[in-house]
Amino acid sequence: MMSARRDSAKITPKEPRDKPRGSLQAFPNQPESKVVDKVVVSAAEAVNGIVDGSSLAVGGFGLCGVPSVLIAELHHSGVTDLEAVSNNCGVDDWGLGILLKDRRIRRMVSSYVGENKEFERQFLSGELEVELTPQGTLAEKLRAGGAGIPAFFTATGVGTQIADGGVPWRHAPDGSIAKSSPAKETREMDWHGKKLTFVLEHAITTDFALVRAWKGDRHGNLVFRQSARNFNPLAAMAGRVTIAEVEHLVEPGEIDADAVHLPGIYVQRVLALTPEQAHDKHIEHRTVQPRTNAMNGAAQ
């Protein structure tokens, strides 16, 4: 489990809102509630406190839902020696790939890394330590960290090097394996009337989390859109200080409570994107057909 740092910037609450309405008025000695406005004015303020050696949980899947503005600001700040937890590491010129390219990331915990050639080069040359983790297990490790569950048992990985140990974590410059994963605890349990073996996986918590949301309010309540939801809520739960860049900032109360994907209790800072930033989205592989062919195919 990654240790949570205590050197992050403190967020000071703004002025309290008007007196609460309704039944609370019947209790004159009831203290007024203080609601924190979590909006920051710049990307630099948003990433303030992220220092060399910090651990980060970063949302996104491929290039979808990636907090690209926050990552770019981190790159601009010069911070280095980072430990990043993310499903993948972007591509060579986008997402976490821009940090990786300049050797800002020391260690990655990831599930899929096949789209980044620089990632492969650094891993095989011994410059980067990588803990490959099954995708579903990675998702649950992040969720467990946010839910206060220190560890859990899963059937995923039983009978493989994930459970038995020996997955290469770091190579030596000559290509040999310098560090590999340790063996994990396994246990037999009754499951649907059968004795099955499960492996113990530990939760992940990080110093900071960087996520991207489609909509958010000043209290940090977030709504994600379609595929961009992916690992973002899970990463947000795992971070001690969670920073969200949002495409559309709205006032408190404009998001229906039933529509909230991630409650504001998990979010400490909100950065409103400009329209240009919100529309700057990349894809890995364009697979569309020419319009004429697509129309002919539909007619058939």
Report the location of each language-model feature.
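Conserved alpha/beta enzyme-core scaffold
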Residues: P13, R17-Q300
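Position-driven detector of the extreme protein N-terminus
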Residues: M2-S3, N296
